[in-house]
Amino acid sequence: NKIISAHCEVNDLLKGGYIHDGVYCKEHGHKGICSKSEWAQIERDCKLAEKTGCRYHVCHISTKESVDIIRKAKARGVKVTCETGPHYLTMCDEDLQEDGRFKMNPPLRSREDMNALIEGVKDGTIDVIATDHAPHSKEEKSKGLKGSAMGVVGLETAFGVLNTKLVKTGIISLEKLIDMMSVKPREIFDISGGKIEVGAPADLALLDIDKEWCVDPEKFVTMGRATPFQDWKLQGENLLTIYKGEIVYEAL
């Protein structure tokens, strides 16, 4: 009863693209990645999961079609779960700049896609919000949209971004955000812990949900510092991280 987890991408449809095949792509002479390269595999895989009865998890969805396909599959009883990332819920291709910190895979999609993802979070179609944390060196991310490596960091900004843009605006509750970032991943992937009780592993984070801070990559603890959220003013910061009973991060 193991789960199958997939990064969905049809290679034949990529055609050398590296950002979303939208208005920005065309106006600036870039090669685009079409939405179908993602949702076509999800559509196929959901049919296979329905036929076989297997558990299927879709990583970092980014398109409105993906949300719709998964929503309909769940309604049919398919054992499918999915996730998206903070950047797909708070940015779109209108926010792109000629900078490697805006390059990730899947790419930032259209505003319509972003809004569909938000609806998917609200109605429960999307189960998990994960960082898709992909650290790269400064050199690897210094070659613009075309030449930079795919992927951005997210560990140090995820809660602040989502708390600011989804919770403080009333789109979802704090409890739902915690569930999507912490509880649901544990349940889906059969990870022990995640409970505050005697004898349970002490894996905890202490968060100040109202603390205001500005995203400064130079202050990141991690080596990867390519973030599209640079200079964003956020509410909600991690003050303490305990892993297996040991304090591994402290900013009290």
Q: What are these model-derived regions, one by one?
A:
Residues E27-R55, G120-D123, D127-I129, A134-I209:
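His/Asp/Glu-enriched, well-ordered alpha-helical/loop segment
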Residues E65, E112, M180, D190-I191, ...:
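Short, conserved clusters of charged catalytic residues that mark active-site
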Residues L14, V67, T90, S137-E139, ...:
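Glycine/Thr-rich phosphate-binding loops of Rossmann-like dinucleotide-binding domains
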Residues G85, G100, M104, K141, ...:
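Glycine-rich, flexible loop/turn motifs
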Residues G144-G147, P201-L252:
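C-terminal cap of metal-dependent C-N hydrolases
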Residues N1-I129:
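Histidine/acidic residue-rich metal-binding segments in metalloenzymes
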Residues L14-K15, K31, S62, T90, ...:
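Generic, ordered loop/turn and secondary-structure boundary motif
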Residues E9, S62, G85, A134, ...:
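Anionic group-transfer/hydrolysis microenvironments
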